[in-house]
Every structure is written in C-alpha cells, then in structure tokens.
Amino acid sequence: MSTAIATTTLEELQSAESRLLVQTYGRYPVELAHGEGVYLYDSEGKRYLDLLSGIGVSALGYGHPAITKAITQQAETLIHTSNLFYHRGTTEIALRLTEITGLDRVFLCNSGTEAWEAALKLARAHAGLLRSEGKQIGTKFLALEHSFHGRSIGSVSTTHKTAYREPFGPVMPGVEFIPHNDIAALRAAFSNDVCAIAIEVLQGEGGINWISEEFLVAARELCDSTGALLLLDEIQSGMGRTGTWCAYQHFPVMPDVTTLAKPLAGGIPMGAMVCTEEAARAFKPGMHGTTFGGNPFACAVAIAVIDTIKHEGLLEHVTETGTYFIEQFNALKHKHDAIAEVRGTGLMIGVDFHSADVAKHIHETMMKRGFLFNRTHDTVLRFLPPFILTRDQIDIAIRAMDEILTTLTPPVASNPSGEKVHG
C-alpha cells in the first residue's frame, strides 16, 4: 500500500494538507519547489524574487556552494551523537559565537524559541543563585509592548500580543509589559523584584521598531544596580542582518544574554543562547538540556555560514545594499502619500502604510508579480531578503511597487518650496 500523497495540483495539495496537518498556519497559495541564489520557483516554474528568505533564515540564499558542501560532507560523516559525547563542532561554533557577540559562553539548541526559553530559565536560575548569596532579587520579567519572543509557554509569556497568549492561559506569571522606548515607565516598573529585562533590539513581528539608545542604556544601568540580567533577543536581527553581527553592536551597551537563531545554520534548525561568565555560572549539569541541540550536522553548517559571511564581506554588503534599499523606499514615500514611514537598518526593513487595506493590496499584488515578502502588524510590509541581494534586484522590486502605488493614488512631486503637490 502506497503512502504517497496523490496530488497533481496546488488545490489538491491544499486539500490534503487541510486533512492531515494541525492547522497552525495560514499559508499563501503558492507551492515552492526549488531555489537558486535569491530566487524561488513554484511548482509551475514561476520565479519569485525572495525578499523574505524564509522569515530571515536563508541569509545566503539558495544553493550556496559553501552551505551545500558543508551539508554534504557532514551528512556523509556524522549527523548526530547526543550531548553525552564530545565532538569538535560544538567547540568550533561556540568559539565563533563568542567572538562575534563579545560574550563568554554558549548553549546550543534547535530554534529561536528554545534559545529564548533557555534565557528565561537562566535569568530565573541566576536570580536564585544571587538570593542564595544573600542578595535581594525576585523572579519578575519586564518585557516590551509589541514584542515577540516565541511560542513556547515561557517565551509566549514575554510576547506582548494578546492573541498569542490568551488561548494558553494562564501563561507564566510574573511578566509586566512596558511601552516601547518609555524610559519613565521602565524606571517606574523596575525594582528588586525584577530578575531580567527582556528586549528585542529591533522588533520584527512588531513592525520593525528600533530600541532607542537611551532606553537600552537605562535598562543596562537598572540591571547593573541589582544584578538583574539584560536579555537581548537577536533571533531576527542578529547574525549580520543589520550590518553588524548583532543589532546591539550599534549601541554602547552589552547584554548579559543574547539569543541567535534564524540564519545561524542557513536553514538547518539551530539556535544559540550566548551569555556572560557571570550569568552562565547559574546553570549546572542537569539543569537544562536538549537532545538535538548542537548536533554535528547543524554545527558544521553554522560554521560554514559564519565563515562565509566573513570571507565574502557580507556585513559590509548588507550595510551598503540595505542603505540603498531604504533610500529607494524613502523615494517612494516622497512620491506616494500611501506610505507613512520607512524603518529599519541593513536588510531588516519595514515599510509602514497609513492603511492596512493598501498594505494588503500591495503585498498580494507584488506576490502575483513574483516578489515574496510579508505583512506584519497589519500596515507594515516586512523585508528580510538574503544578504546576497543586489542593487539591480532592488531596482526591479522598487519599480514594481511604484507601478502598483501609482495605480492607487496620483504620484506626488515637490514644488520649488519643498512642499508636496499632487501631479
């Protein structure tokens, strides 16, 4: 008896999936079949310029020779051992992660959610260690409005959106949400009851919102005053997406703990929690663990990803290409009143529209034309393209969006006084 799914059309595949899978995602009506460089191809051969990279995962695009080589060689050698034995890959990737983050120790896992869950557990364990040493510190977390940290019961507790938390209530207690970049609210909420402040340096799901330097400095100072930990979530913004290895490296602030995932292993599931020596002393053998985390296969690919980003100068390329992309989006904003704001740095960009309906229309029409990105926070189009994106490819996307916007509203030009006038 065959177990193959007999489907020949997208509609048949959709029907089969609706019967067989737990329905946790609303998918776009596209069946992707293969990829090459920055392009994806659907089952009918249509080509798409990928400006989302699997929600920030495929930073080196598709079929990169360094990644293909690492996958092939390691698959032929050793895929899994468990964490009961040594293998060289864990030390090699940990060395690279401590170098690029400026931190001291690494916990390897399988996803961003797992990395964040480890960070939360570490913060609670560290507070317990401090209490055993006679210090006064509690178990409360301060998180930010519009934050997204994952979907496990701990990480979703520090995720702000009510729709993500309510179905699973009561979630983990002891979390208070602070308005984004509101230093007065942060100071008012902070006390010896707090074991950690949790921050996305550049919010992704929340609409591409930077933390301010002043807020981050204040958070660091408050944590230093009591021994609480500063947790910086770099799952989406890290690994070079903003032109630095971590987005916090744009500021004069170091975290106690940071979390990395998404592009870390080029599409192979992997996450990492990286922390200071002080924070790490709270974990002892047996307190936390993972069966698959840090396996030889994922480590080999992650090593190849980091080395390729270095050797190909992709941090500089992301900075230059991202600056150009943002400049072109701002030119569209100047021309079309539909765009409210352009936000982001490097290749983590949000284009915010005044109208959710317009944002939805642009997104759907661009997809039909062969461009992949997504819409978040209703009005924001989110762009997380592969790091190898070129200016020519950006120009193609900008022209397409300009054409669609022009059909919606008359373009806007500047008169000699600098004021906008409709043409």
Describe every region a protein language model picked out:
Residues 2-423:
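Conserved N-terminal phosphate-binding loop of PLP-dependent enzymes in the Aspartate aminotransferase
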